[in-house]
């Protein structure tokens, strides 16, 4: 009888081992990044300051445009952004060719009715991103950055002219010609820097502070960090 009880308790103890061990085998998944909302002045204060270095930069270090967020729609990132930002939707033909449609380029306030007249601008230009920390990223992370549709402000459809004028300059050297666009632009610039953990140089930071402490003091910045 004692031997039978011993066997029974032994079997029960073995059966309990996986039950007791199971929580450890299913560790909780890391929490998703939380969206941050703050004033422009506070957001500017979160941007780290370092010297910029463009050594080794080429645009080919940032693969774009890739096949976009929806791999089944036949559209690349450029066309997906155009579709998302159209105020009048274009017709999508075979091969994701876009015809018709209307867009408003907020940099200069221009209405555009031809997709071919638009550039998709990286809010923080690729060269500026390289200077500000992306030079240390993997090629895969740089590709994600160059095609980032996870935040509405990362990529923006604007007139080719305004995009060429901007080139790879930061707000110390270029701002949208439309005064109504400038606070939005500064907010989206800072949002992108914080989203990707990019730094600023001294001149850039001082320019951002001028807007944050002056005409754009009521601007709100929203961003979700990329991990």
Predicted regions and their residues:
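Secreted/periplasmic proteins that engage bacterial cell-wall peptidoglycan
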Residues: 51-126
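Domain-level detector of nuclease and nuclease-like folds
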Residues: 103-227
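N-terminal module-boundary/linker segments of secreted carbohydrate-active enzymes
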Residues: 16-19, 27-72, 204-206, 213, ...
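Secretory targeting and sorting signals
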Residues: 1-29
């Amino acid at each position: 009888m004692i031997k039978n009880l011993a066997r029974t308790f032994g079997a029960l103890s073995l059966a309990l081992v996986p039950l007791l061990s199971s929580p450890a085998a299913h560790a909780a998944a890391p929490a998703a990044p939380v969206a941050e909302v703050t004033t422009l002045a506070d957001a500017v204060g979160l941007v780290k300051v370092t010297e910029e270095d463009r050594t080794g930069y080429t645009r080919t270090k940032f693969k774009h445009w890739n096949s976009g967020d929806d791999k089944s729609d036949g559209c690349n990132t450029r066309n997906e952004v155009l579709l998302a930002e159209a105020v009048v939707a274009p017709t999508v033909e075979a091969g994701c060719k876009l015809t018709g449609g209307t867009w408003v380029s907020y940099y200069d306030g221009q209405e555009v009715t031809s997709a071919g007249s638009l550039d998709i601008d990286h809010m923080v230009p690729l060269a500026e991103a390289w200077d500000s920390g992306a030079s240390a990223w993997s090629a895969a992370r740089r590709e994600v950055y160059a095609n980032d549709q996870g935040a509405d402000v990362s990529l923006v459809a604007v007139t080719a002219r305004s995009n060429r004028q901007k080139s790879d300059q930061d707000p110390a050297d270029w701002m949208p010609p439309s005064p109504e666009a400038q606070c939005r632009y500064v907010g989206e610039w800072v949002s992108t820097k914080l989203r990707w953990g990019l730094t600023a140089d001294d001149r850039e930071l001082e320019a951002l502070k001028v807007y944050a402490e002056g005409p754009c003091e009521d601007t709100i910045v929203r961003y979700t960090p990329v991990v």
